[in-house]
Amino acid sequence: MVQTSPGYGITIRVEGRPEFQPVAEITSIISREGATITALDVAESQLDNVVIDVTCDAIDSTHADRITAALSASPILKVRKVSDRTFLLHLGGKLEVQSKVPLKTRDDLSRAYTPGVARICQAIAKDPSDARRLTIKRNTVAVVTDGSAVLGLGNLGPAAALPVMEGKAALFKRFADVDAWPVCLDTQNVDEIVRTVQLIAPVYGGINLEDIRSEEHTSELQSRVDISYAV
């Protein structure tokens, strides 16, 4: 039996008249359609009308559409809105940058930025290995892709690969406390990708090659870039 998945979760806002027992109608229809109800909330309640948000997991997008259509077909219900919970989670992306140090006073600013930061720059210029100790480099990974082999979806290109790279970066942070950032390149040329990684390498302690079809990048990076990498 095919299982429902939170990856296809939807929230449907439905309204109906209380005397017609809309909650019973909603649960009956969704159960009949083979979905899994995970939440049911009363959003509005009046004497002559009740608005209910029902959240359920579907099998796939087609199944979600079928559930919505079945609710819409009921003579005692009116579907107001359908929200795809996965799309909602991705609104605005899944990552953000936050400062590790407070910038509350002039003293804070003077040490974190100018003029104090100049001494840090000079120290690294004198001994480049200090970059790992005094910057984000030692705990930062670039998640690099050209979008040529995105999950099981094929060659979707760099923009469409970005949600996957955001997710990989979130996993780095959650499970290893490593700061990772997506780098989606608008090229599928091996030399251009390797050269780009070379150019951005000063910022990162590691490179994660993700969802890239060609296997040439690994050996090329080994020979050209002094940096940790993973595929």
For the regions a protein language model found, what residue spans apply to each?
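A conserved regulatory-domain signal marking ACT and ACT-like small-molecule sensing domains
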Residues: 1-91
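Short, hydrophobic/aliphatic alpha-helical segments
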Residues: 7, 139-142, 224
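A generic "cationic amphipathic patch" detector
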Residues: 43, 67, 84, 156, ...
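Conserved protein kinase catalytic core
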Residues: 45, 151, 226
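Metallocofactor- and cofactor-centric catalytic cores in central/energy metabolism, strongly enriched
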Residues: 49-52, 78-215, 219
